[in-house]
Amino acid sequence: DFAVTSSQKCLMASPGLSFAVVGERAWQAVERSPFPKNYLSFEAIRSTLARDRAETPGTTPVSLVLQVREGLRILTEEGLDHVFERHAEMAERVRTGTRALGFGLLGAGIHQRSPTLTALTVPDGVDANAYRVKVRSGGVQIAVGLRSYAGSCVRVGHMGDIRMDDVERTLEVMRSALS
């Protein structure tokens, strides 16, 4: 009933914009909720957008809106079916390639894994934070896990305008960083 994303994900823009789609059942829950909405009120946003001259709830970051528009143009040009297929193929390559390097996959089942990001447990004896720094020195950016996974997990993104040659280069840098 709620779908939420942000500009830096598959839309290929800088961070700073969030997008939410609210379904009918979710609207009913919002309207029934007794909790105060001091920071984010979907009701206030809806009424603002319904005006003859719609307004955003704050200052519009025009440069980010233009980035998102360009990302959407690129996605439309490639075709969503092809984009989804490309992301699934890259996800599978990252997973098979990293398993061969001794990494484990987080998420027990296929339905728990995203086609746009792979979360991995690092091999025994490898500190995720130090490993991320070594990978970065090879020109590739990966992220460490969050909270309790910070020292034992890395995250590899394969979304947006990433291609299979980028995935292969990432795997090569990750392999080199293990030695």
PLM-predicted stretches and their roles:
Residues 148, 152-179:
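PLP-dependent enzyme catalytic core of the Aspartate aminotransferase-like
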Residues 1-8:
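Conserved active-site segment immediately N-terminal to the catalytic lysine
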Residues 103-107, 140-145:
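A short linear hydrophobic-aromatic micro-motif
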Residues 130-138, 170-174:
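Short amphipathic alpha-helices in soluble, non-transmembrane regions
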Residues 104-135:
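Conserved PLP-binding catalytic core of the aspartate aminotransferase-like
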Residues 91, 111-117, 147-155:
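Small/polar glycine-rich anion-binding or flexible loop at a beta-alpha turn
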Residues 11-96, 100:
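Active-site C-terminal subdomain of aminotransferase-like
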Residues 22, 120-124, 158:
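Short beta-strand-to-loop capping motifs
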